Curated annotation (Swiss-Prot):
Positions of the catalytic residues: 448, 450
GO BP, sorted A to Z: DNA replication; nucleoside triphosphate biosynthetic process
UniProt cross-references to CDD domains, sorted A to Z: RNR_II_monomer
Name of the protein this chain belongs to: Probable adenosylcobalamin-dependent ribonucleoside-triphosphate reductase
Gene name for this UniProt entry: rtpR
Cofactor(s), by name: adenosylcob(III)alamin
Catalytic activity, EC: 1.17.4.2
SUPFAM superfamilies, A to Z: PFL-like glycyl radical enzymes (SSF51998)
The keyword Transferase appears for this protein: no
Length: 758
């Protein structure tokens, strides 16, 4: 039986009639006639009404491709129950033992309608159903061809490859895809990993870049930004306060009507709008807003839909106070690069403190600006110590520049990183045949610098694990479904018009590899080259095929190497191109202190301590054995790491390779300048990290700490199996990770001490 429901027809475009034989004739624009055989029908009249047609002849008419159907008519996509039932009995293949399961339960296992948490097979079901429903809705909206049987077969294959962790959507996708966030609210920005915003045009709308960063960060999107707007505007200051006799209750409680009071709504939009009002009051010389925080939920209440628990209004009030304190000192002066970074960092601090997200930011500055280079020198800028940790700081390096001063700073605290914007604009992969200037509009990159981006652009990442495959043929099949997931995400527009203009034109994705160190160890570098070359070629062919089917542009770029972190832990893979710190090490992960995951871990004997950077998180230490024979990062020279990044930039990544090179400050520090002289022509970006084995006590609560076999055995001897089944009696709202799930995106600094914040 074919049913068409909720179809609204415009009286100026459509007329209908019904004859005695049950044939319904609908004239579309008085030209094209579509007929249905039916014994039951409800016809439209002169006004817009519902057309309800049942096809009792069951003739399988393909009606969904007609432009007539302005509302959804294709049945909602769902994987078959009998297919899912087979996986409900299979053990989830989490990597690294308890670590992979902790990360999953902490970050991606949503609470279901029956008030229990998802199991892995259910999370995968939600994600795959969500992916194919995005496709279905796009097809329906644009009158394209949809084959339900073909979709079911394709979705089942995607499901299997995610369940077995041959590829995984990013953490944002694992958490949000198929949830109310995308299905009913349509917040597709939550499926994207990263963004960039330039301050170059700050004069047109001074608060806009800051507001975009805050809104995106609260959706879990990591944001890069530049300082090109410095000196573009004067910080004017606020209008004088109203007369003392004017009482607050006498004022209108809506902004925009020459009034001061703003009741902050208990929503992401409300928090963002409050900051916009405050910034505009200084940039555009408007009234000083008076904020009423009474509508914001109390501390400890759950943040439904986006995960986590509320910390009350205090983080937002603190942000308001800090913005006022910062800008009051700058009235009458041009906005500086320091002002720009400070404002972005203060916003990031609020997002972290508010338990909404872990903010991930990267700042891009002028390599010739000593003011910018010194931002994380807290002897010079002690006032920044409480918030400067919120961004990685990098410079737009110029080809042929003198790297001496930059390298001096890198030796001090590992920053700044370097981004060669000329290379990012000019090349796809870094080979002469791909000097194509596809990204001539690019202005920066994302916080981990694996994606070239235009201003206000978002992009979606997806992660594949070559070492979890037995053959190239199997891996190429995985690439098909990994690509299809990422391409599907580009179908969803966002709430930001500026973003949609770029996103829908570029359709940029980043199909990544993790476990590269493992693959090289077991298969060799030459085989990796073969897989890269063949995989890259296939992705180009797949883009041709699926872009034609969906009637959208081909993706401007498709491949990258992201640093990974939590998602690679699920699959038991080393992160991105990076080698493990050691055969034996301690892995530290951050969990909200209110999380129900903490008691079972403490009961099992795992070490748990407060996180030093804020009062809302605790740090859990987990001993890891990465496997015999795998080379450790400490055994690989700086030059070899740079060579591997260059290899991947040449054979795989047309976006970028996220590469954090660890180095020996004593032996290799003097070579930094010379290394950059060579590799500036082979890379698009790179960052450096002083080797912890030679700089003891530099970092607090690092994500990784090298240990020896003796200490490893001592730790595990005191551990018991963790019983997570008790959590089913106490549902746990997960806390999704920041945009790219990486352990190297957010860097917390305290004087000379730096934290890679997971």
């Amino acid at each position: 039986m074919l049913t068409i429901k909720r179809l609204l027809l415009n009286q100026n475009l459509f007329k209908s009639s019904c004859n005695s034989t049950g044939i319904i004739s609908i004239n579309y624009n008085s030209n094209n006639k579509i007929c249905f055989f039916s014994s039951s029908s409800t016809l439209i009249n002169k006004t817009n009404e519902i057309l309800d047609i049942e096809d009792n002849n069951n003739n399988n008419n393909e009606i969904s491709s007609s432009p007539l159907f302005l509302k959804e008519t294709i049945k909602e996509f769902k994987l078959k129950k009998e297919f899912i039932e087979k996986y409900s009995k299979k053990k989830a293949p989490f990597g690294f033992g308890v670590l992979g399961e902790i990360v999953y339960r902490r970050s991606y296992s949503r609470v279901k309608e029956d008030n229990t948490n998802e199991q892995w097979f259910e999370t995968v079901e939600r994600v795959v159903n969500g992916t194919y429903n995005i496709q279905r809705k796009w097809i329906e909206r644009h009158g394209l061809e949809w084959n339900q049987n073909k979709a079911q077969k394709s979705a089942q294959e995607m499901y299997n490859r995610i369940f077995e962790m041959k590829f995984l959507p990013p953490g944002r996708g694992l958490y949000s895809c198929g949830s109310s966030t995308t299905e009913s609210k349509g917040l597709f920005a939550a499926l994207n990993n990263c963004a960039f915003v330039s301050t170059l045009d700050i004069k047109k709308n001074p608060s806009k870049p800051f507001i975009f960063l805050m809104d995106a960060s609260m959706l879990g999107v990591g944001v890069g930004f530049d300082t090109k707007g410095e000196n573009s505007i004067i910080i004017k200051g606020q209008l004088p306060p109203p007369p003392p006799q004017q009482q607050p209750q006498q004022q209108q409680q809506q902004h925009g009507q020459n009034n001061n009071i703003f009741i902050v709504p208990d929503s992401r939009e409300g928090w963002v709008e409050s900051v916009q009002l405050l910034l505009d009051s200084y940039f555009l010389k408007r009234n000083n807003p008076i904020f009423d925080y009474s509508s914001i939920r109390k501390k400890g209440e759950p943040i439904k839909g986006f995960g986590g628990v509320c910390c009350g209004y205090e983080p937002l009030k603190e942000l308001h106070d800090e913005i006022r304190a910062l800008l009051n000192k700058c009235i009458g002066k041009p906005i500086s690069s320091t002002n720009i970074v400070d404002l972005m960092n203060l916003i990031g601090k609020c997002v972290v403190s508010g338990n909404v997200r872990q903010a991930a930011e990267i700042a891009f500055g002028d390599p010739n600006s000593q003011e910018y280079i010194d931002l994380k020198n807290y002897q010079i800028n002690p006032q920044r110590a409480s918030f400067g940790w919120c961004s990685n700081n990098s410079v737009f390096a110029e080809l042929g520049m003198d790297y001496s001063k930059v390298c001096q700073s890198i030796l001090h605290n590992g920053e700044p990183g370097l981004a060669w914007l000329d290379n990012m604009k000019a090349y796809s992969r870094m080979v002469p045949t791909e000097l194509d200037y596809k990204d001539r509009r690019a202005m920066g990159g994302n916080p981990c610098l694996e994606q070239t981006l235009e201003s206000y652009e978002l992009c979606c990442l997806v992660e594949t694990f070559p070492n979890n495959h037995e053959s190239l043929e199997d891996y190429l099949k995985t690439l098909k479904y990994a690509f299809l997931y990422a391409k599907t995400v580009t179908l969803g527009s966002t709430q930001w018009p500026d973003t949609n203009k770029v996103l829908l034109r570029n359709r940029r994705i980043g199909c990544s590899m993790s476990g590269i160190a493992q693959f090289i160890h077991f298969n060799g570098l030459h085989q990796l080259k073969d897989w890269c070359v063949n995989g890259f070629k296939l992705l180009n062919e797949l883009d041709e095929k699926y872009s034609e089917w969906l009637a959208i542009p081909k993706s401007i770029k498709r491949t990258s190497i992201k640093p990974s972190g939590t998602v690679s832990l699920l699959a038991g893979a080393t992160p991105g191109m990076h080698y493990p710190i050691s055969e034996y090490y301690i892995r530290r992960i951050r969990i909200q202190k209110e999380s129900n995951l903490i008691p079972p871990l403490v009961e099992a004997g795992y070490h748990v301590e407060p996180a030093f950077e804020n009062s809302t998180n605790v740090v859990v230490e987990i001993p890891i054995h990465s496997g015999k024979g795998i080379r450790s990062a400490n055994s690989i020279t700086m030059w070899e790491q740079l060579s591997l990044a260059s290899f991947l930039q040449k054979y795989w990544a047309d976006n970028q390779v996220s590469c954090t090179v660890s180095f020996d400050p004593i032996k290799e520090g003097p070579q930094l300048k010379h290394a950059l002289d060579y590799f500036q022509y082979q890379l698009k970006g790179v960052s450096f990290l002083p080797n912890s084995s030679t700089t003891t006590s530099v970092y607090k609560q690092m994500p990784y700490e090298e240990i020896d076999e003796t200490r490893y055995n001592q730790i595990i001897a005191n551990l018991k199996p963790v019983d997570f089944q008790k959590l089913n009696n106490s549902p746990l709202e997960p806390t999704p990770d920041k945009f790219c799930d990486s352990s190297s995106c957010t860097i917390v600094s305290d004087n000379s001490e730096t934290l890679n914040n997971l």
